[in-house]
Amino acid sequence: MDGRSAEEEERYKWKQSDAFIGAVEGFLVQLEDRLIDFKDIEYKNMKKSAEELLTLYFYKFTEIPMLNRMEAVMEYCVDEYETLCGKSLREDELEIISEKFLSMYESRDIYEIYNWFLEEQGFDTLPEVPLAERYLQYEDVYPVLYLKYRLCQNRQHRDIRHLVIDEMQDYSYLQYVILKELFPCKMTILGDRAQSIDSKEQDVLRFLPKLLGKKGLRVIELKDSYRTTLEIATYAQQITGVEGIHYLERHGKAVEEIRTDKMQAFEQILEKVHLGTDGYEDGYETAAILTMTEKEALEAYAFLKERREDVHYIDRDTSAFKKGITVTTYYLAKGLEFDQVFVLGGDKDHAFYKQYLYICATRALHELGVFVVN
């Protein structure tokens, strides 16, 4: 999210889209002809020609994913042989036969097969490195998972009767496809469209009816907002332009927008923090400084931590939330709420700026200050 170029952003969005799924499905059709080099199989009195194996693979076991299909062909041939011979093969014999069948695959490596797909699409391929040194960029995690799901036998979680998905706006089309395949059950999907961390608001309601089926689909829009003061709620509404929301008539301080330089912003935030632990009878329990990037958050944390003990930094590995002053990025603050929120910095020309400002604003319960840093 920090520092993603326009080209990387477009590539990421494509890899999460229905267009990507269409490209993968087309690739899989061609892959069937490329993936296996059929050869005659002979072990003792068990003999199968390449033509017989091809027929079994393409016509008898078509419902089985490609990387598991040759095992099904082998089991069929072994069962036939054992029936004719009237005895079972030993484990060591089955291992030899299995190796003969599986060696017909040009590759069974999902990583390598995904590289074939990337090459076909004109993208840079993943590094050809030993297994222990492999890693995936975030943009490739779900595409690889989808490809693996299509190529390998996967267990559906039929023991799950009802799936609840929160923050629905942060899931891509591809992720919903994977969830639908893994959990063939009823779902409750919750979220706020305006809080999308995509550069453009993603209205999942445009594609969910098609993906999940319109039958039995019920959409409920909640129009009442109780969490923030009317001043903060109105400020957030002006960012998104969403209308028709009823806000609770709870008034508080006006939202402050302050244009200043970075160091003055740090100093003013320290002055404005109003916690009960500072001796204020009406003091708050929590305050937060939210930034657009991790670099900005770390810089703010370093400055504030030197001046106050109760400053805490939240990163991806944080497991516990503490009272006091929290410093983190806006995307890690999703789902959290604070009595006071200070929005620090951010590039107004950045593709994520509107979502950044809205998410930060909706984290505040009582006071909101927005520092536009020169």
Predicted regions and their residues:
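Alpha-helical nucleic-acid-binding subdomain
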Residues: 1-163, 170-178
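Conserved helicase motor core of SF1/SF2 NTP-dependent helicases
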Residues: 1, 122-128, 149-162, 169-374
